[in-house]
Amino acid sequence: MDSSSYLVDDSGQAYEAKGLSDGKLNSAWFEGDDSSGLGSWVKFDLGGTKTVSGMKVWNGYWYSQDQWSRHNRAKDIEVEFSDGTKESFTLTDNMTAEQVRFKAAKATDSVQIKLKSIYRGSTFNHTGFSEIQILDQS
């Protein structure tokens, strides 16, 4: 797993990409840019070619309802596969896990998700996800 950047908060807590697949909704990946993170990305290495059909996304910081509303959430995302093809999606602004389906099942060895636009949080200008699960048909 890789990312364009990640946030380290004032207490030294690092919000790295590995937080996206740890099974814990109270952890997260946040981009570490000085702005809202447009163009930032996170990349899942699938460990070989897998056939993927979509993903399940826990958008924003699910530590609590309060923290979810205070941080930015992704609105528009671009998903890129290892062959360079891309698909775009608009996520909802709800604290519910969202299933995203690709146009067709795709053989790929990586899935990269790029932030294209956001829903603004009430306090913090960082954007992230608590969990992302790649749906593998292999």
Model-predicted regions and their roles:
Residues 6, 15, 61-63, 119:
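Sequence-level detector for tyrosine residue identity
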Residues 36-41, 63-138:
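Trp- and acidic/polar-enriched beta-sheet ligand-binding modules for extracellular glycan
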Residues 45, 53-58, 80, 114:
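Beta-strand residues in well-ordered beta-sheet regions across diverse protein folds
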